[in-house]
Amino acid sequence: MTKKKVFCVQFKGRQRFLRLLGDSSKAKGLRSGFVILKSKESIGLHNTGLSEEVISIINGSGLVCYGKKNSVKIKKNSFVYIPPETLHNVINTSKDLLKYIYTTARVK
């Protein structure tokens, strides 16, 4: 088994999407990324599949919509947990950029 090493990723420039973890040589089961959404923009409806997901809001505000008609308001310094097999979308409802970090971990 290859020994994993501690590493640091620096956010550079104005990238709208930056994968932080996802390369199996860096992490065993975690996946993570940094996302920037413009006003009224969404990440798109997607499913967590066999993974749990957490979203940590760094800037802005918006909604996490999940299931058929459910949503939770998000804003700077908030944290959202999304269970496995959950259809969801992240939407920027503010005039400011919505910046967040997502992390997923396979549980099944």
What is the predicted role of each segment?
Residues 1-31, 44:
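A short, N-terminal "cap"/entry segment at the start of jelly-roll beta-barrel domains
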Residues 25-26, 50, 69, 95-96:
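Short strand-connecting beta-turns/loops that link adjacent beta-strands
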Residues 26-28, 38-42, 61, 106-108:
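Short, charged/polar surface micro-motifs in flexible loops or helix N-caps
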Residues 30-32, 42, 52, 97-99:
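Intrinsic-disorder/low-complexity, polar/charged segments enriched in Ser/Thr/Lys/Arg/Asp/Glu/Gln
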Residues 32-36, 54, 71, 79-81:
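Conserved hydrophobic/aromatic beta-strand scaffold that supports enzyme active sites
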Residues 42, 48-76:
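A short beta-strand-loop-beta hairpin characteristic of the jelly-roll/cupin
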Residues 75-76, 84-108:
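Ligand-binding loop in jelly-roll beta-barrel domains
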